Amino acid sequence: MGKWFTKGRIALLVIFGVLIADQLIKVAVKTNMYWHQSENVFKWLYDKLGIDATPPTWFYIYFTENNGMAFGLEIIDKLFLTTFRIVAVCAIGWFLYKFVKKGMKTGFIVCISMILAGALGNIIDCVFYGVLFNESTYSQIATFLPEGGGYAPWLYGRVVDMFYFPIIDTHWPEWMPFVAGERFIF
């Protein structure tokens, strides 16, 4: 590595690069799609490029918003959850700093930097999106800085989720209790 591309600078480039891309994609999805609207990325790309073929079906932009923790769970108060996220990002940042100072492998630093950037992006969603956007619904696309104000106060916004990879698309076995024969997508 050259003098300019130190591990610390690489970490910062990854964090800011991922964070900027994350927020640009989230704002584009939020201001151009209805809630739970889904678009096959390859179909869209094939249409734009004029490719006459059946596109793969394993990568979608599926607009949803997450009220709570992973999988949309809402076990604890939203304010506590947002505060916890901020504390967790500070801890990840501190560990990243220590890893850089210890001279850990660049690949490891990049991975931790991407995790940190994703967590920061979710904090931005929680802190600002409730104030900056109105409600996204099945019949209304959100607008930036609506006249009547946003859908939630500071720290109470929802995390925008949009990447969907239905890699496994099958049916449960007939012998499986409660879900026998039902479709299973993961």
Where would I find each of the regions flagged by the language model?
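Alpha-helical transmembrane bundles and membrane-interface segments of multipass inner-membrane proteins
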Residues: 1-186
